[in-house]
Amino acid sequence: MIGKKVLDEIYEINIAMELIVLGARMQVLESETSVSRRRLVRLYKEIRGCPPPKGMLPFSEDWFMCWEQNIHSSLFYNIYLCLQKTENERPITTLMQAYRLYLEQCYPHSSETPVLGLTRAWTLLRFIGCGMISRKSCMLCAGGFVMVTEFIKEPFTCSLCCPPSRALKKFSATSGSS
């Protein structure tokens, strides 16, 4: 029986290590693993070389509704849903797999900072779980996008089908510099 407990602890520490490497904040680590806070802080310092950042997690569904953040959040959530249907894993494991796939698709050869960090991806799943955010299909392209639940009954056009002018400016600026 003790062997099982040691293996469980190793499994939890491995999850914590993967989460730290992917950029998780302490609140995510404490919520998703059974490792003590003291050990998590030590692990964080060993892996990152600095103490974990202090402060509260972002708490606003509005962040996920801005055009660029919405596209990235929706892409991540669609990957997550696909993995959730095909894999029989713990939700945190599915989150990590989906986040890695998101990074592969959006940043294959780049060292840029991702639009959607792991902590925000985790927060998105929590918002969806408590009903603050839902998924809806675009009426033009039929792609699945995240949106605030209170507007779910209204017709919806995604920012890929109808990009805001600032998105077009950003795209022309980045394509002109390449």
UniProtKB/Swiss-Prot annotation:
**Known cofactor(s):** Zn(2+)
Cited InterPro entries:
FlhC
BP terms from Gene Ontology = bacterial-type flagellum organization; positive regulation of DNA-templated transcription; regulation of bacterial-type flagellum assembly
Q: Where in the cell is it found?
A: Cytoplasm
Q: Which GO terms describe its molecular function?
A: DNA binding; zinc ion binding
Any one Gene Ontology cellular component term annotated for this protein? cytoplasm
Residues annotated as binding Zn(2+): C138, C141, C158, C161
**Keywords (A to Z) from UniProt:** Activator, Bacterial flagellum biogenesis, Cytoplasm, DNA-binding, Metal-binding, Transcription, Transcription regulation, Zinc
Q: Which domain of life is it from?
A: Bacteria
Task: Write down the NCBIfam families for this protein, in alphabetical order.
Answer: PRK12722.1
Outline the subunit composition: Heterohexamer composed of two FlhC and four FlhD subunits. Each FlhC binds a FlhD dimer, forming a heterotrimer, and a hexamer assembles by dimerization of two heterotrimers.
What is stated as this protein's family in its record? Belongs to the FlhC family.
Protein name as annotated = Flagellar transcriptional regulator FlhC
Q: Which organism is it from?
A: Erwinia tasmaniensis (strain DSM 17950 / CFBP 7177 / CIP 109463 / NCPPB 4357 / Et1/99)
